[in-house]
Regions:
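N-terminal, Lys/Arg-enriched amphipathic/low-complexity engagement segments
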Residues: 1-44, 59, 91-93
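A generic structural signal for short beta-strands and their flanking turns/coil linkers
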Residues: 27, 70-72, 88
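Short, conserved secondary-structure segments in the cores of folded domains
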Residues: 41, 47, 64-67
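Short, well-structured beta-strand-loop connectors
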Residues: 45-59, 78
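Short alpha-helical basic/polar micro-motif
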Residues: 49-52, 72, 165-169
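Buried, small/hydrophobic-residue-enriched core segments of structured protein domains
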Residues: 80-188
Length: 188
């Protein structure tokens, strides 16, 4: 175990209260290009298209088979591009009803296919270069980081504690599928 003696200490008062509130309805969400370093998108939607949670928005030209999906149900309001058509963002106007793409097959092969098909693989990173893995790459080990030490960051356990059984089942399924060690990093 490592203990850091020095670090960045920003004098900000207060901290997140550790609760999740349903008080505010979100009207728009965005998928931001700068969040995906080195990714070149091939758009699969246009302004005005209706999308569900998990609907494909675009595919990475550099890594065919890597899809980026919608975080909300709604209508594509705009696709924003910058200089030389660089991808800036997709804005989605959120609808009142929430629907998602349904997945019925739970075989190991189908799960591996769905990890890339529904954009889950974008949350995985290879080491040492922090790239999105190829869909057919088999990891030696998987590390799951539940530590966020950024100032005013929320403890990830707040989101997980309602679904901790599902999280644990997911870890066991990943271990079964990839036949590798799973390491979960968290703070006490």
């Amino acid at each position: 175990m490592y203990n850091l003696k020095k670090g960045l200490d920003i004098p900000i008062s207060g901290s997140p209260d550790g609760s999740i509130s349903d008080s505010t309805k979100i009207s728009h969400v965005g998928v931001l290009g700068p969040d995906y370093v080195g990714m070149k998108p091939t758009m699969m939607v246009e302004s005005g298209d209706k999308v569900n949670i998990g609907s494909k928005l675009f595919e990475d030209k550099k890594n065919p088979g890597i899809f980026y999906t919608s975080p909300a149900t709604g209508t594509i309001k705009s696709i924003n591009r910058g200089d030389k058509r660089r991808f800036i963002s997709i804005e989605i106007e959120v609808s009142d009803e929430e629907s998602q793409v349904e997945i019925y097959n739970d075989s190991n092969e189908a799960i591996i296919d769905n990890i890339s098909k529904f954009g889950v693989i974008n949350n995985f990173r290879t080491r040492p270069f922090n790239k999105t893995p190829k869909p057919n790459d088999i990891p030696e080990d998987i590390f799951i980081n539940l530590c966020d030490t950024n100032p005013l960051s929320v403890d990830p356990y707040i989101y997980l504690h309602h679904e901790i059984d599902l999280f644990n089942k997911s870890l066991l399924k990943l271990k079964e599928i990839y036949k590798c060690n799973i390491h979960v990093c968290y703070q006490n």
